[in-house]
Regions:
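Aromatic-lined carbohydrate-binding surfaces of glycoside hydrolases
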Residues: 7, 18-25, 32, 36-195
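Surface-exposed loops/turns
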Residues: 10-14
Length: 195
């Protein structure tokens, strides 16, 4: 089966409309073509502007599915093309809340013991969403997750921990670990100041 979406302009007159669609592809290495006729009944109804906030999860690390199963590098032209297709399509179907995967790139402090944050990549994504999507709300990325995705599993967080050599490593730590608390104490004030 196939779902065919046909946008109906708000000023379209009610009545029956006829059309056709041609679908082509490959089956067992051979080109196939199918033509189908269809009829659409348009009713004299105009829906009010959507008031519901709608979010759907999307996964940029799965953009390969939109790119002939080829890996899509983050922040590449192919990445932004996949993102554009995704947000424009989802917006057309009513999505207006967007999950922000970028949280700010950690930057070790000069002494190597703490972190500051570079929010330029996050800003780039926000600006992109504002240009290409219906945005009523931007949802921050989930900070803590369940360790095995079960409702009763303990929370953990994947946080950057300074390595003492001017860089950092990500570590998956229990939510109540002092290093997670140190990250929270550095991150949220920096984010608030940036916003």
């Amino acid at each position: 089966s196939l779902w065919l979406d046909i946008p109906i302009p708000a000023d379209a007159e009610a009545g029956l409309y006829e059309g056709s669609v041609r679908i082509s592809g490959l089956k067992n290495g051979k080109r196939i073509v199918a033509d189908r006729q269809f009829t659409i009944q348009v009713y004299p109804v105009t829906l009010p502007k959507q008031s519901l906030l709608v979010t759907n999860w999307y996964f940029p690390d799965k953009f390969s599915f939109m790119n002939d199963n080829e890996y899509v590098e983050d922040d590449s032209p192919a990445y932004w093309e996949c993102m554009r297709q995704l947000v424009e399509t989802a917006s057309a179907y009513g999505q207006n809340v967007w999950l922000l995967y970028e949280t700010g790139t950690p930057v070790p402090t000069a002494d190597g013991k703490g972190l500051t944050f570079d929010f330029s990549r996050m800003d780039k994504t926000i600006e992109f969403l504002l240009r290409h999507a219906d945005v009523r709300l931007i949802e921050a990325n989930h900070f803590a997750k369940r360790s095995h995705n079960g409702w009763t599993d303990p929370f953990w967080a994947n946080v950057p921990v300074p390595d003492g050599e001017g860089s950092y490593v990500y570590q998956r730590l229990p939510y109540d670990d002092p290093r997670v608390q140190q990250y929270i104490a550095a991150y949220f004030p920096a984010l608030q100041e940036h916003l």
